[in-house]
Amino acid sequence: MNMRIIEAVDIRYTYPDGTEALRGINFHAERGEVVALLGPNGAGKSTLFLHFNGILQPTSGKIMIDGEELDYSKSGLIKARQKVGIVFQNPDDQLFAPRVDEDVAFGPLNMGLSEDEVEERVRDALQKVGMLGYESKPPHHFSGGEKKRVAIAGIIAMKPDIMVLDEPTSGLDPRGASQILRLLHNLNEEGMTIIISTHDVDLAPLYSDRIYIISDGEIISTGAPSEVFSDIDTIRGANLRLPRIAHLVEILQKEDDLPFEEPYPLTIGEARRKLRNQLR
C-alpha cells in the first residue's frame, strides 16, 4: 500500500494577473498523519490547498491522490473531491443553505446516495462535531466556532480519506479553537489524514506529526516539529517566530546562562521535563 495518500509534485501556479504564487512545491502526507503547512500570510498556503482536490489546476506539476494523478475531467474531479475534503478559512464561504441539515446533506446528495444513507451521514456528522439538535437552525446566525463545526460536518458527511483545513482556528476564541482541535484529533484517531495550514507557531508542534514551512511560494523546510524549529534562522527568515516556550528557553540560555541543550522544548510538557532535570 502506498503510504503517501496525497502528494504535490513540483507544483507551479501563476495567477492570471501574472503573480507567481507557487514555485516548484513538493509536499506529501502519509496515510493517518497530521501535517501542518506553516507560513506567514501571503506565502501560498491557501493556493496550494486549492490544488489538492482540483479547485485550481497547476500551471505545471501534478497532484497524486492514492498513487493516481489527479484527473481534471468532470468524473475525475468528483472522484478527487470524494477523497479530499477542503474546509475554507472563512466558513461563510462554504455555508449556503438556510438550514444546518440541508448544508451538511449537500455533498452526500451530490454523490447520488439514497435518502436514508444521506440522513444517516448527516446525523453521524453532526454528532461528531457536537451539533446534533441544530438541524433546523440557520447556520449564518451561529458563532464563528459553530459555523466552522458545521462546515467540517459537511466534509465529514462525505467520508473523505483526507481533510484539508485552511487556518482552522483563525478568528476563534480559545474555547472555540480548542473544540476544533479536539475534533480534528478525534477524526485523526479514527484514521482520517488531516492537513492544516496555519501561521500559529504555538499550535503546529502540539498537533502535527510533520511540518512544512512555506515562504514566497516555496517549501523551505520540512520535518518533525523538533527538527523544523531547531533551525531558528530559517524560522525567522520566513517571518515566523519560535513557539513562546522555545523562545523563553532561548532567552534563559543566552541571557541567563542556563544550560539548556538544543533542540529547545516546544510545548509546556517538554519544558517542564527539561526544567525538572535542571533543578535536580
Swiss-Prot record:
Keyword Transit peptide: no
Keyword annotations from UniProtKB, A to Z: ATP-binding, Cell membrane, Membrane, Nucleotide-binding, Translocase, Transport
Pfam families: ABC_tran (PF00005)
InterPro entries the record matches: AAA+_ATPase, ABC_transporter-like_ATP-bd, ABC_transporter-like_CS, ABC_transpr_CbiO/EcfA_su, Co_trans_ATP-bd, ECF_ABC_transporter_ATP-bd, P-loop_NTPase
Disulfide bonds: none
Localization of this protein: Cell membrane
An annotated Gene Ontology molecular function: ATP hydrolysis activity
Membrane topology: Peripheral membrane protein
UniProt-listed Enzyme Commission number(s): 7.-.-.-
Binding-site positions, ATP: 39-46
Domain ABC transporter: 6-241
GO biological process, one term: cobalt ion transport
Any one of the GO CC terms: ATP-binding cassette (ABC) transporter complex
Record bears the keyword Cell membrane: yes
Role: Probably part of an ABC transporter complex. Responsible for energy coupling to the transport system.
Recorded family membership: Belongs to the ABC transporter superfamily.
Descriptive protein name: Putative ABC transporter ATP-binding protein MTH_133
